[in-house]
């Protein structure tokens, strides 16, 4: 997350309409060099303001990845910026759904299931893959990346409409709201800064264990057999 960026982003208001636009990525010039995004900082500030003020519900597919990146890139100044982290968690997790979690609860069985967006929206969006799993989006032509990003957003709406009724019909809504969604906050925080640790208590326990280790070692070394 600290070495990532926000290449492009998409917002869709239903499964047929949306917009995608560049943030940090502007494509490459004729020599193959990255074109600098001169207005990236302005767009980032606008995105942050949008997320802070928007009162509607946002839907993601794999929120544990998307929001994890967005919090670090839009709200944190550095890896130890706890204030920015907590503010970002409050803002980004105010009202949301995750179609990956919904799909899991709607399709989970002993036979297994696939939770990736493309598999679950294939009948709607077809095969829009850009080939192998994307490792570096800056190697993709900007127009193609924007198109790909937009189809992702539209497909997320489709998957929500497809599986949310099934999740509710199967009496999984309470599990979704009371177990899965609360866990996401802890998961994202741990992804950003590691597992929360009570440092004073950790130091206290470490000192106790170190003392006990030394005591037992001396006891072993003092044994005549040794």
Tell me what each language-model feature is.
Residues 6, 142-150, 172-180, 199, ...:
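Amphipathic, non-membrane alpha-helical segments in soluble helical-bundle scaffolds
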Residues 12-15, 193:
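Short strand-coil-strand connectors
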Residues 175-226:
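Extended, well-ordered alpha-helical scaffold/bundle regions in very large, multi-domain proteins
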């Amino acid at each position: 997350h600290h070495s990532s960026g926000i290449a492009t982003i998409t917002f869709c208001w239903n499964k047929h309409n949306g917009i995608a636009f560049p943030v940090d990525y502007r494509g490459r010039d004729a020599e193959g060099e990255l074109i600098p995004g001169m207005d990236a900082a302005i767009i980032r500030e606008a995105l942050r303001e949008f997320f802070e003020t928007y009162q509607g519900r946002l839907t993601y597919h794999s929120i544990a990845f998307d929001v994890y990146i967005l919090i670090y890139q839009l709200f944190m100044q550095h890896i130890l910026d706890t204030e920015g982290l907590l503010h970002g968690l409050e803002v980004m997790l105010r009202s949301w759904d995750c179609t990956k979690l919904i799909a899991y609860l709607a399709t989970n069985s002993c036979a297994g299931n696939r939770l990736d967006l493309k598999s679950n929206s294939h009948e709607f969006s077809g095969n829009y893959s850009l080939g192998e799993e994307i490792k570096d989006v800056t190697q993709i032509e900007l127009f193609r990346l924007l198109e790909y990003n937009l189809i992702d957003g539209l497909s997320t709406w489709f998957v929500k409409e497809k599986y949310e009724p099934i999740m509710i019909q199967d009496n999984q809504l309470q599990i979704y709201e009371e177990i899965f969604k609360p866990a996401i906050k802890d998961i994202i925080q741990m992804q950003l800064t590691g597992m929360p640790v009570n440092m004073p208590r950790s130091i206290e326990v470490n000192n106790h264990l170190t003392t006990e280790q030394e005591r037992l070692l001396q006891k072993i070394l003092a044994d005549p057999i040794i």
